[in-house]
Every structure is written in structure tokens, then in C-alpha cells.
Regions:
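Residue-level recognition of oxygen-bearing side chains
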Residues: 102, 228, 241
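C-terminal helix/juxtamembrane-tail motif
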Residues: 242-244, 250-274
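Extracytoplasmic ligand-binding clamshell segments of periplasmic binding protein
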Residues: 187-189, 245-248
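GST-like domain detector, emphasizing the conserved glutathione-binding G-site
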Residues: 2-162, 170, 272-274
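GST-like fold's C-terminal all-alpha helical module
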Residues: 107, 121, 125-238
């Protein structure tokens, strides 16, 4: 048997909290996981079903340096050698799950959103949509963060945003066709939510905001061209299980993505507060 991680209590947090989720203080990849946790709390037995540890994306004692030099090192030694953000601590099961897709899959099964049989059709559909939506997320990363051959200034961001929105229509069309092919409201089950739906919602929701940043004549309503996607987006927004999430600061106040730290350049950093 391989060596097992040493599990140490952290201020007795697991005695009252079922899940602790850690991520940067933004929506990004954290938003779908936060949504899942809000969804799951309806059947929670714990007094405090979840807690968030939001890491500030600043190079100071409470931000990036603390995560990489202290918290991540501790996690590697005590609970998961793959330590990364986002992470999820399941205090009841004494597990630390890392990486976005793995965390969504874990919570999807914990909350009964996804079927447990690996070869089930729901699991197959869920996995395919999860990867398709992640491709769209990767395209967003190239738009909002400073990478070679990507945006470096506010002017470049303003120029590339319309091009990005036009390009994302290809993904929207594939997702629209998928919903039409199966005649589903949601992506992996006809009338019931699966874990892939949370990231799909977040990416559509982010793009709804990006459209508001366009100049006058360039403003558009991309989602109106895809009625099934629009219905899906509205159906998720109206779910009573997510009401507390949509009222939370994590949804209303957090930036969609972080400002980059590269070369002290803040970048456009689209924010839900703009």
C-alpha cells in the first residue's frame, strides 16, 4: 500500500464544517465549485455545510506568497502531494481533492447530481460537456491574462474582445446543437442538473458580462442567437437551490478573473463591479 497522507486537524474546523473550499478571491474556476456547494447545502446535516478560504491575488503576506510558501507546502506534506488551487477539503471523509474538474466530479457524486456508474450515459455526457466548456475557458484565459501573442494592454483587450465574442459563437453553436440533439434543458440530463452545468452556466454568464464592455456600435446580444442556451442559462439562474449563491458576495462582488501579476501590469481584469 502506498504511503497515506497525514491528516491533521486545522483549528477543529472539521467538527462543525463539512467542506472547505480554497481559491483565489475571484470567480474564475472557483465559481462553479461555490455554486455546487450552495446547491449541496440544502441536504447538509452539518451546522456549517461549507466554508470558503479566498486567497487574495496580491504579493503580500496574505496573498500569493502565503499560499505558495506556506499553505501549499503544508498541504503537500499533510494531505495531498498534488496540492493546488482550487482545492476542496472534505472534513467528514478526511480527504483533500485538488484540480477543478476532479473537484466538480467529486461534488457531483456526493450531492447525487451525477451517476456513480462510470459507464453510465449521464457520466459520458457530463464528461464531454465538461471538457468542451473548459476549452471555452482556455480561450478566455488568453483574452484576459498577459501571455505571449495575447493581450498586453487595455487597447489590445478592447480590440480583441469583439473577435473573441465572434469566435465563441462556434462553441455556443456546438452546445446549442447538443441540447437540440438530445432535446435537453440541461446538458447531461433532460430536466435535471449535473455537475457540468455549473461551469457551463458560469462561462455563459461571464460572456454576458463581457458584452457590456463593448463600445456603442459593437454592443451585441450573442445569447439571443442561441435559444436553447438562453433557456439553459435562465433555468440555472432561476433554480431555488442557487438563490443564496446568486445573492452572495462571491457572485455579486468578485471579479470574473484576476488581474495578472506579470511585470506589474494590471490588465483589463473584467469585473462584475464595472
Amino acid at each position: 500500500m502506498p504511503p497515506q497522507p497525514k491528516w491533521k486537524k486545522e483549528e477543529e474546523e472539521e467538527d462543525s464544517t463539512r467542506f472547505t473550499m480554497g481559491y483565489w478571491q475571484m470567480r474564475g474556476l472557483g465559481a462553479p465549485i461555490r455554486m455546487l456547494l450552495h446547491w449541496g447545502k440544502q441536504n447538509a446535516e452539518k451546522t456549517k455545510p461549507f466554508a470558503f478560504k479566498d486567497v487574495q491575488y496580491t504579493q503580500d503576506g496574505d496573498g500569493v506568497n502565503k499560499w505558495f510558501k506556506e499553505d501549499k507546502v503544508k498541504m503537500i506534506e499533510e494531505s495531498n502531494p498534488l496540492a493546488n488551487i482550487p482545492y476542496l477539503i472534505d472534513h467528514e471523509e478526511k480527504k483533500t481533492i485538488v484540480h477543478f474538474l476532479a473537484t466538480c466530479d467529486y461534488l457531483g457524486q456526493k450531492f447525487g447530481l451525477d451517476e456513480k456508474e462510470v459507464d453510465s450515459e449521464q457520466r459520458e455526457r457530463n464528461a464531454q460537456i465538461a471538457m468542451e466548456v473548459y476549452d471555452l475557458r482556455n480561450n478566455v484565459i488568453r483574452l484576459v491574462y498577459k501571455f505571449p501573442n495575447s493581450v498586453r494592454t487595455q487597447e489590445e483587450f478592447d480590440k480583441q474582445l469583439p473577435e473573441h465574442l465572434n469566435a465563441c459563437k462556434k462553441t455556443y453553436q456546438k452546445l446549442e446543437s447538443w441540447l437540440g440533439f438530445y432535446d435537453f434543458t440541461y446538458f447531461a440530463k433532460k430536466d435535471e442538473v449535473s455537475s457540468c452545468d455549473f461551469h457551463a452556466f458560469e462561462m455563459i454568464d461571464q460572456h454576458e458580462h463581457y458584452q457590456t464592455l463593448l463600445a456603442g456600435d459593437e454592443k451585441r446580444d450573442v445569447l439571443s442567437e442561441f435559444p436553447r442556451l438562453k433557456k439553459f442559462h435562465q433555468a440555472m439562474r432561476n433554480r431555488p437551490e442557487l438563490k443564496t449563491y446568486f445573492e452572495s458576495k462571491e457572485y455579486t462582488d468578485f471579479q470574473l478573473n484576476n488581474h495578472t501579476l506579470a511585470n506589474s501590469w494590471d490588465g483589463p481584469g473584467p469585473s462584475s463591479m464595472k
